[in-house]
Amino acid sequence: CFHQTKKGLVLSCVVAFLMISARKQMVIALAMLAVCILVRGIRSRNAGRSVALLAVCAAGVLGGSTLLDLGYNYVVRQDAVRHSSDGRFITTMAFYTAERSDAAYIEDEEIRELFLQIYDACDEQGYLKHSAGKGWLNRVEHFGDSYDCIQIDTMWPAVNAFVRERYGEDDVVLSEHADRIMGVINVSVLPHNLGKLTASFLDNFLSGLITTVAQRNPVLNWYSLVAYCVYLLLFLWNLWVGKNRRVLQIGGLVLLSIFFNVGLVSLVIFCQTRYTIYNMALFYIALILMLNEWWKARSF
């Protein structure tokens, strides 16, 4: 896509569409496509054309994904609606970082009572951030252990019961009202806990960098640090000394992809390996390619 052939651009859009349709986390594929198009535009001094091209590609990929969602739900549920409940990840973060006093920010009395019901159940079990131990590793492990307990075991059943009691059993109606309720909680509570959200994000981001290249344990944590240092040194060498621009491009795109993916995951969920492993093979392939360029230059 750096060379922006029509075939390469169309293929990149198709791949991005398929990846996003399979897993919404793969919106990073569209972000990487955007980087390639914009870099190409800057290099060719035709930024305006690249921005327009990016807009067309993004509209095509996201529009196609939306149509697929609508079509799937129409076939399965006989109702053309978007995929629902994506906001539950953000709401889980809202509960994890909240304090009981944050209920005062929710204006709707019924939703406020629901918030307190879920909050008290989570707090009693020690699922919330203020129950985490001291130190980075304890915080990360507590968040990972608590996340599904908050969302799957506590919040989701309570929200579903709340909606069914008031709006009936229809799945589409249930999903719409559940999304609305979680949206109210998110908008009301999250802005008052930005500091704790940022702290959790940074903890998760570091954890995600580790689980991208290894596993999280006292020995491999240090290995991960060494691996990233070696990668960055080789990348800088290829930037300043190396002659193979394709290897440099691969190294840079893989690094950007890791940052995008880990950043996105860290915002909404804990960085377990199944969310970060997508870039593991790419990391080591790029590392070997850059190491090979350095070795060939050293050999002559």
What are these regions (language model features)?
Residues 1-8, 298:
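Membrane-interface transmembrane helices that cradle and orient dolichyl/undecaprenyl
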Residues 6-8, 43-60:
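Membrane-interfacial entry segments at the cytosolic side of transmembrane helices
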Residues 11, 25-40:
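Transmembrane-embedded, aromatic-rich helix segments that form part
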Residues 169-259:
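Membrane-interface anchor segments at the N-terminal boundary of transmembrane helices
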